[in-house]
A protein has these predicted regions:
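Short, charged, low-complexity amphipathic alpha-helix
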Residues: 1-24
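Coiled-coil termination/hinge junctions
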Residues: 40-59
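A short beta-strand-turn-helix
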Residues: 55-85
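Amphipathic alpha-helical coiled-coil segments
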Residues: 17-34, 38
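Thiol/selenol-based redox catalytic cores and closely related redox-interacting motifs
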Residues: 131, 135-180
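Short, thiol/selenol-centered motifs that function as redox-active sites or metal-ligating centers
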Residues: 73-125
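A common structural microfeature
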Residues: 14, 21, 28, 51-53, ...
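Conserved beta-strand termini and adjacent loop/short-helix elements that scaffold enzyme active sites
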Residues: 59, 117, 139-141
Length: 180
């Protein structure tokens, strides 16, 4: 292990370590309770109705956003960075995507559909996905404003100003909403 600050932790007896660990555990539990409160507050944030009928490009051609849910009540969108003029996807996004095949199965059993969306053309996404050995659902938003409307892609003008930054069906028929 390399330490960048050049300091070394104190070496102690097992009893000293145990006492320090117990004190630290008290702080960890406080943090857990605080994190639980913050998570509850995040879940209680209001939703924003999705006003546009976004249509994405995928394996079957054009698909409306509401159909991306595949009959489930929630949709998790991973905004995979892959611009139209790139030859391959973002390396960091690719790292995370290596786990999407199994995560998708887990989420499906919990009434959640997980997909990736990128601005690159669908054919380019599909070729990269095949090369990487992935089978998760991936759609192109290259023919709509989705990425721009939800602040994950930016025009040069927006980049010069304030840049900001989730979707679910609720018991209101086919209306969609954006969440945290």
């Amino acid at each position: 292990m390399t330490r960048t600050d050049l300091s070394k932790p104190k070496v102690a007896s097992l009893n000293e370590w145990l006492e320090a660990r117990k004190q630290f555990l008290i702080r960890e539990k406080e943090f857990t309770r605080l994190r639980d409160q913050l998570c509850k507050q995040r879940r209680e944030l209001p939703w924003v109705k999705v006003e546009k009928n976004y249509v994405f490009d995928g394996p079957g051609g054009k698909i409306p956003m509401a159909e991306l849910f595949e009959g489930r009540s929630q949709l998790v969108v991973y905004h995979f960075m892959f611009a139209p003029d790139w030859n391959e996807g973002c390396p960091s996004c690719s790292f995370w995507a290596d786990n999407f095949n199994v995560i998708g199965i887990h989420l499906n059993h919990r009434d959640v559909t997980m997909i990736a969306i990128s601005r690159a053309p669908w054919e380019k996404l599909e070729a990269f996905k095949r090369r990487m050995g992935w089978n998760f659902k991936w759609f192109s938003s290259g023919n709509n404003d989705f990425n721009y409307d939800y602040h994950v892609s930016f025009t040069p003008e927006v980049l010069k100003s304030q840049v900001e930054y989730n979707y679910g069906k609720w018991e209101r028929g086919d209306e969609l909403a954006h969440d945290y």
